[in-house]
Design a protein with these regions (language model features):
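Active-site loop segments of alpha/beta catalytic cores
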Residues: 1-153
Length: 153
């Protein structure tokens, strides 16, 4: 089946201990997540975003996607723990409000380097743990990109 897509970025908002127990999510959420992800399983790259500060990381880490993004700077696990508990790429290292919106270029460069250190530079996609604000200063976004470019040379 031709879809014309390379994959999806799938946001999971209810797999959150502040909203449901793990048993409740396994009954009422996980089956639907898995049906959606099964429909795109043959795509080249699928990523799940685990939304919220009390996400069910270990449950979602079993979804069989290529990358997992979560609020790593606001809640657990850390990137270092995440790369140990999830077999694919981890996506994070930056907090969307304090770092990307209100931070400064030098601080962001430092955080990019920390993310690389915490993961050993393997299986890492440097990103925010949630959406990047549309009003984030371009100088901050440029600093993030430049820091990544310096590392991957």
């Amino acid at each position: 089946k031709a879809t014309g897509i390379a994959g999806i970025y799938y946001a999971v908002q209810m797999a959150n201990f502040g909203l449901l127990s793990e048993a409740e999510y396994r009954a009422f959420g996980e089956p639907y997540d898995r049906r959606i992800l099964a429909a795109v399983a043959d795509c080249w790259f699928n990523m799940v975003h685990l939304h919220g500060r009390a996400g069910m990381f270990d449950l979602v880490a079993q979804y069989g996607v290529h990358a997992l993004n979560w609020h790593d700077r606001e809640s657990g696990p850390s990137l270092a723990e995440g790369v140990q508990r999830f077999g694919g790429a981890v996506s994070g290292g930056l907090e969307h409000w304090d770092d990307i919106l209100r931070g400064d270029p030098d601080g962001l460069r430092r955080l990019v380097h920390e993310a690389v250190e915490h993961t050993g530079g393997r299986r890492l996609i440097v990103s925010s743990g949630c959406v990047a604000p549309v009003n984030a200063p371009f100088s901050n976004l440029r600093a993030i990109r430049q820091a990544v470019g310096e590392i991957v040379r």
